[in-house]
Amino acid sequence: MKLNKTVLAICLVSFNLHAANLVYSANQNDNTVSVVDADKYKKVGSLTLGYPAGDKRLYSPLYNGEINVHGLSYAKQRRELSVVSTVTNSVVRFDTNTGKKIDTIYVGRNPHEPRYTNNEDEIWVTVRGENYISIIDSQTGNEKKRIELESGPGMVTFSHDDKYAYISSSFDEHLWIVDTKTKKVIKKLMMPSSFSPFINTTPDGKEVWVDHKDVGEITRISTKDNEIIETFKTGKISNHFAFANNKAYVTVGGENSVNIYDYGEKHAKLIKKIQAETLPHGIWADTKGSKVYFVNELSNTLQIIDADSDKIIAKLPVGAL
């Protein structure tokens, strides 16, 4: 059985399971995770974590479901999906072979995004309502360590060798670089923004990119020396980005577009804009770099881009994003 993975947020994750290319989308307004067959462009199921927003049962003293299902991370070898719900302060893990819940882990106020280390031994969760990273042992599901920071962290990504973790902030200009072995901050970089909710590593591992949603910019960091390469303008309400076919795809909510950049040189260059629906947000590419999937927050749709032609080839409804 071969598995490949992709992740998007408000979140989307895709991977190959039993020869079906599946995409998972976290839907924060109906508290579900949509399951999409990416080859047939069809929603094939959902994982229900709670009642939808507005349902009076959410306020029951006996309610034990999740609220504001938001962040996803997938472990390829473990066949495991972690789902963060920001209001109920939880990480729910699912067995992706069966679709059954493994456990629920409570990590602290307003977690944002989970991320498995590349070796899948740990799950690092940014607890941005407080000021720390919650590190979960993926074998036991127990929290093993907290890394305290100056402010609430937004998201974490790793170098390909798992030596360093790069952590953005949701509340100030810090970006922290952490030694994953000692769990100590070894360097801090200052960003041009106090709201940097999304971060990821390029497919070749040479760079880490950080999105600055409030100012519509992205910063590129070299993983060789952990220094800033450049910060470039992307557009109002720049949400997330993905990499495919040696290009970067950025969802720009204020323009309802996906902006495509060539980043082969020192300065990223805009090469095309693709019109999206309403407020494009989460975006990720498949492992082959042939397709890019993104969700539109206000139209509750998933659209698929062919990375060769850079044209939208499919659209389908998902849950209430």
Where are these regions (language model features)?
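Predominantly soluble domains enriched in secretory-pathway, periplasmic, or organellar proteins
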Residues: L12, H18-L321
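Gram-negative bacterial Sec-dependent N-terminal signal peptides
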Residues: M1-H18
